[in-house]
Regions:
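Generic N-terminal leader segments that precede the first folded domain
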Residues: 1-126, 137, 141-147, 491, ...
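Solvent-exposed, amphipathic alpha-helical segments
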Residues: 15-22, 181-191, 312-319
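Conserved alpha-helical "signature site"
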Residues: 31-34, 38-67, 192-208, 213-243, ...
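Metal-dependent phosphohydrolase cores
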Residues: 73-75, 128-162, 400-406, 466-483, ...
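Buried hydrophobic packing segments
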Residues: 75-83, 135, 139, 181-185, ...
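Metal-dependent catalytic cores of enzymes that make or break cyclic nucleotides
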Residues: 87-100, 104-225, 229-234, 241, ...
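Short, solvent-exposed secondary-structure boundary/capping segments
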Residues: 252-259
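Glycine- and charge-enriched low-complexity intrinsically disordered segments
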Residues: 260-298
């Protein structure tokens, strides 16, 4: 039998307070990162199953816990809500929630002083200034597994300041932006002794007006849409009584409780416009704080979530299985995917002398012909698959991927036998793998060592800031998606085949990476082997004038986006 929601919720809060207390016991430090990871998982899972119970932490301040604990709980809930509103996967969500839990680990005493408006001593000021470095040091006691979270903490203070600064300071890491946003909001909404805190909606409104950061603005809008107009735990005025709002049911009726009778709560379901006060308030009643969320009345609605990525993966599978590229067959398969059809109409423009888009699916197929259609259709579907896979660096990954695709298209543009859409399909599948399986490792860095590997070329993942990947898992996923594409095997083999044993098919991928290194990490000179491979392959690819190739490469206007 499942544990009662109230029990799970109370245990989560108790464990959060216990986690924060372990900082004072150095013998516990090695256990802190695994504990933070487990707590982050519990927050994510409970939020996905019982969002109202956790959202109520943003309005119900529990005096049984310290101010620091209430603050960390609020910030963890906001982080979980932000991740849910963006549809981030479990690994990414748990990393960000863990960073939120860890951020205040070393300054619990200082946070409580802030709440009481007690002046900081010099030692407090020093600890406060170094809080993120101290937290990172404690986490690294658990080993290298904590490195991703310490990298988030390293820039967190800078991001917090930049989110509310003018003039605009460019911020490039969406994950740190999300954590900083959750911090600013929680610091503003958590109840304090001076009663200077504000409601969540007021905090979001103020921040929306102040921040110049576009990603932060998008996060705020998504969070408001996700939470809705009323927060569980808010005090509302109904029938001339102050009641407590808990949830809204499938029929859009608000679930309220009245505490007018001290011996028994009275439950209401009403359809009305409510005047609410979502400002956090002290709640000492365990029934209101925890037990009401055991009720069937506040069960979250079972929403039918459409998994866009899964829908596209099924389309890829169906096209591959049926080998169906006739208009009649494709129109049936693609009918549920109007955006794919619209993108296909755009993708066929290079096959039109006037460079005009097609009018519809039938026109698209007639423009490109039966031979070219399969690769173009697959490319459009794979491109959309990457575009709908949520990640804070999704725009960057897409931009870098498009750069690699353009380079490959240019390399093979003089070859009449090989269609660039067919060759580049594995790149889209590779990018999708990175977004879904390496989401916590992705960064804007180009991780090619200054000291070249004498045996292997740098892997594709290094252009997306990922140092190493599970090659077995990568091979399995790419083969599953593109088993009928010979360039997939060539790409995978080129990542692991020693330089002495490379085939011509392998060397095409090596050439792509050499040119990409020139573009995205121009400060790193090519090795003699790279230069020789590039020269040989350009000739094979019918680029007899290298200056012509470089001139056309420059016209692509690729750049190393930060």
């Amino acid at each position: 039998m499942d544990e009662a929601v109230s029990t799970t919720l109370e245990q989560l809060l108790n464990n959060t307070q216990l986690f924060l207390s372990y900082y004072n016991n150095k013998q516990k430090w090695t256990a802190l990162y695994p504990m933070a990871s487990k707590l982050a998982e519990q927050y994510r899972v409970l939020y996905s199953k019982q969002p109202f119970a956790l959202q109520s932490r943003l309005t119900l301040y529990n005096p049984s816990y310290s101010y620091a604990t209430n603050l960390v709980v609020s910030q963890s809930v906001i982080t979980a809500a932000l991740c849910k509103s963006q549809n981030y996967n479990s690994a990414l969500s748990e990393l960000y929630i863990a960073a939120t839990l860890i951020e205040h680990l070393c300054v619990g005493a200082q946070l409580n002083k802030l709440c009481e408006q007690t002046p900081f001593q010099d030692s407090d000021k020093k600890i406060w200034k170094m809080r993120h470095q101290l937290a990172a040091k404690v986490m690294l006691a658990s080993g290298d597994s904590a490195k991703p979270v310490t990298q988030l903490l390293a820039k967190l203070n800078k991001y917090k300041q930049a989110l509310v600064s003018s003039p605009t300071i460019m911020l490039y890491d969406g994950g740190i932006t999300l954590i900083a946003l959750a911090n600013i909001i929680s610091m503003n909404i958590t109840s304090n002794t001076a009663n200077k805190h504000i409601s969540l909606y007021k905090a979001l409104t103020d921040l929306y007006i102040r921040t110049p950061n576009l990603f932060a603005l998008q996060l705020i809008k998504s969070l408001i849409a996700h939470l809705g107009p009323l927060l569980p735990g808010s005090r509302v005025l109904y029938a001339e009584q102050t009641m407590i709002y808990l949830a809204t049911d499938a029929q859009q009726r608000h679930v309220l409780i009245s505490t007018a009778n001290p011996n028994k709560l009275t439950w209401y379901r009403v359809k009305a416009t409510l005047n609410d006060n979502p400002k956090q308030w002290h709640c000492t009643d365990k029934t209101i704080s925890f037990k009401v969320f055991n009720s069937e009345h506040v069960k979250p609605q079972s929403e039918l979530e459409i998994d866009k990525a899964q829908s596209l993966l099924e389309l890829i599978s169906n096209i591959k299985l049926q080998h169906e590229y006739s208009y009649k067959g494709l129109s049936l398969l693609m009918a549920p995917h109007p955006l794919v059809i619209a993108n296909l109409c755009e993708a066929v423009k290079p096959y039109n002398k006037e460079h005009q888009p097609a009018k519809d699916l039938k026109h698209s197929l007639s423009m490109v012909g039966y031979y070219n259609a399969p690769a173009i259709i697959q490319r459009v579907v794979f491109e959309q698959l990457v575009n709908v896979t949520p990640h804070p660096l999704q725009a960057y990954v897409t931009n870098r991927l498009n750069g690699l695709v353009k380079i490959m298209a240019l390399l093979v543009s003089k070859n009449d036998h090989d269609q660039f859409e067919h060759i580049t399909l594995p790149l889209y599948a590779y990018a999708h793998f990175l977004l879904t399986q390496c989401g916590t490792q992705l960064s804007r860095k180009t991780l090619i060592d200054d000291t070249p590997n004498k045996t292997l070329s740098a892997p594709i993942c290094s252009f997306f800031g990922v140092n190493a990947i599970n090659t077995e898992q990568l091979t399995q996923q790419l083969t599953l998606l593109l088993s009928d594409n010979p360039w997939t095997a060539a790409l995978l083999e080129a990542e692991q085949t020693p330089k002495k044993h490379l085939t011509e098919a392998h060397k095409l991928w090596i050439t792509l990476k050499v040119v990409a290194q020139n573009v995205f990490k121009p400060e790193l000179s090519l090795t003699p082997w790279q230069q020789q491979t590039l020269n040989e392959q350009l000739k094979i690819l019918k680029w007899h004038n290298q200056a012509d190739f470089y001139q056309q490469l420059e016209s692509l206007e690729l750049f190393n986006s930060i």
